[in-house]
């Protein structure tokens, strides 16, 4: 599976990642321990090329617990490929960029499932920007994609289009998951 994501380092409640040539340093409360790279190397890897910083590592020097401003030199949006799925990424106020790369193992697992999934149906709740939806669509599964945020569902549709699933049998629902379960 093709991927241009790389986890460069994590610790001190932050992680440093590369998404499609853009290095992102962002606050991550679960990244405990110390950064694996010496601080100088970590700073150097961050300074190379396009980069973004959020929260703790921001130029304001204060921790924002995931709700900070972004600083750095990068496009407002950029793309990355994980498991042959293309994601449009952008900076959000919550410190997210539009993909959870740790889900790649699940997407690979789906891709390796037998082709007899063709025509099956799946319900993807809290579906965010569509990684699992696209992985299932790639196996010919009819997917109901549910998320409460209209902007996130639009973002997922954009990702599906970028990944070649614009015409896949995906039903896009903007609704609170609990309400959606009552209606489905």
PLM ranges: what are they?
Residues 100-104, 175-179:
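Conserved phosphate-coordination/catalytic loops
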Residues 1-11, 15-19, 84-87, 128, ...:
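Aromatic-residue detector
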Residues 111-178:
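Conserved SAM/SAH cofactor-binding pocket of Class I
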Residues 3-17, 24-101, 108:
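Non-catalytic substrate-recognition/targeting regions of SAM-dependent transferases
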Residues 182-184:
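Conserved small/polar residues in nucleotide/adenosyl-binding loops
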């Amino acid at each position: 599976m093709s991927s241009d994501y790389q986890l460069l380092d994590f610790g001190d409640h932050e992680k440093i990642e590369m998404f499609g040539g853009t290095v992102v340093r962002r606050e991550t409360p679960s990244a405990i321990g110390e950064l694996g790279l010496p601080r100088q190397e970590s700073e150097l890897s961050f300074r190379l090329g396009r980069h973004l910083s959020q929260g703790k590592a921001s130029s304001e020097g204060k921790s924002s617990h995931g709700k900070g401003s972004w600083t750095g030199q990068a496009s407002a949006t950029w793309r990355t490929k994980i498991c042959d799925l293309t994601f449009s990424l952008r900076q959000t106020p919550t410190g997210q960029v539009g993909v959870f790369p740790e889900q790649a193992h699940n997407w690979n697992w789906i891709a390796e499932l037998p082709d007899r999934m063709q025509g099956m149906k799946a319900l993807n709740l809290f579906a965010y920007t569509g990684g699992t939806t696209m992985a299932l669509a790639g196996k010919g599964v009819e997917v109901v994609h549910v998320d409460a945020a209209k902007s996130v569902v639009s973002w997922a549709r954009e990702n599906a289009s970028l990944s070649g699933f614009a015409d896949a049998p995906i039903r896009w629902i903007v609704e609170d998951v609990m309400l959606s379960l009552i209606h489905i």
